Amino acid sequence: MSFRFQRSDERKHHGGLEHGSCMAKDLDWMRERFEELSKSGLNWDPPVLESANAPRVVINGKETIMLSANNYLNLSTHPKVVEASIEATRRYGAGSGSVRAIAGTMDLHLEAERVAADFKGVEAALIYSAGYTANVGLIPTLVNGKEDVIISDELNHGSIIDGVRLTKAQRAVYPHNDVGALEAVLKENQDAKRKLIITDGVFSMDGDIAPLDEIVDVAEEYDAMVFVDDCHGEGVLGDGRGIVAHFGLQGRVDFEVGSYSKAMGVQGGIVAGTEQMRLHALNHSRSWLLSGSQPPGVAAAQKAAVEVIIDEPEHVRRLWDNTDYFRRELESLGFDTGVSTTPIIPVMCGESTTAKRLSLAMRDSGVMVGAIVFPMVARDKARVRTQMSAGLSREDLDEVLHAFEKAGKSIGLI
């Protein structure tokens, strides 16, 4: 069978692109689906920032205290990070011009990976375009088929879930942070050819930490691989080096995924581990092989952000000072902060309507905090999620606490 492509003048003659007849005739399902989302209040309508994503931002012309960003260490505007990006862009250009595998790897990328590996205390690292692409690209390469099993925490991030769905391995989910249940699954599957345990390091909805030390002990007993997504732990735990350093597990975790777009304030994902892991991912991970290379300015900023964390430990200390103070004061006002032990501090509300009312009241007071409702969390576990920043002053925090007290009383939450 042969095909002949129409010339543009032929398409116009037949009313093609000009009149939209080449498009699918019925796209009403999109509108109907969006209307259903809107009716249930689950549609996304992102606020638009008119400034840098800093402790105080401008939204709709109004100065607002930012408590919803991942910019934990406030490095997105750090002079050393910004200048590194500008200098590299001037020298190397705005883009890398190719995928990494063909002609898009620059010395800047390798330098950023070397600095990250040294920082993590591992042999090697490989940078991806995002933490999401690291998970969906690497996980499918670690198992072959039905003879293998993936065992995943029930509250793992959606990018992990998507990565697991791309595999043909057997799948098991264990109750959140329940190492006993994890071991029971390992026992049931001890004859599997490959066993892969996957967990978040810091869980993004509740702000609690995986018992990675216990997970690694069990994994070694059953000869299982350990994969940890530490996107919310890097720059936060273990003097900034993440959950592996926090528990002193260097050399015992097979795959450590991280993100440059959170505490490091830049963009991109990273996988850290052995040199063999890097070579494996570089040759088999489709999301790495088929994604455009990070722009030179981004690679330089990635390297600079890690160097700032190493050279200026006061950022991590200030983050934890703010976190401890803010959580303690919230609880003294009568708010429930759940099981959080990190800079992700939820204010538990129960019903979705309560969380939305609290979020709106805080917005009216000049504070940006997001309502997290079903299906992102259970129906009775709605909350307003706050995320702490090292850049917030004590005066900023007191202003936020006053707004929470006022809003909480007005809606009957405290």
Residue spans of the language-model regions?
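PLP-dependent enzyme catalytic core of the Aspartate aminotransferase-like
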Residues: 19, 79, 83, 87, ...
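Active-site phosphate-binding strand-loop segment of PLP-dependent enzymes
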Residues: 172-228
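Short loop-beta-helix segment that forms the pyridoxal 5′-phosphate
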Residues: 99-103, 113-137
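Conserved PLP-anchoring active-site segment centered on the Schiff-base-forming lysine
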Residues: 138-158
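Conserved PLP-binding catalytic core of the aspartate aminotransferase-like
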Residues: 317-326, 331-366, 376, 380-381, ...
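Structural motif of enzymes handling amino- and sulfur-group chemistry
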Residues: 293-312, 318, 322-324, 331-333
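N-terminal "arm"/small-domain region of PLP-dependent enzymes with the aminotransferase-like
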Residues: 26-92, 224
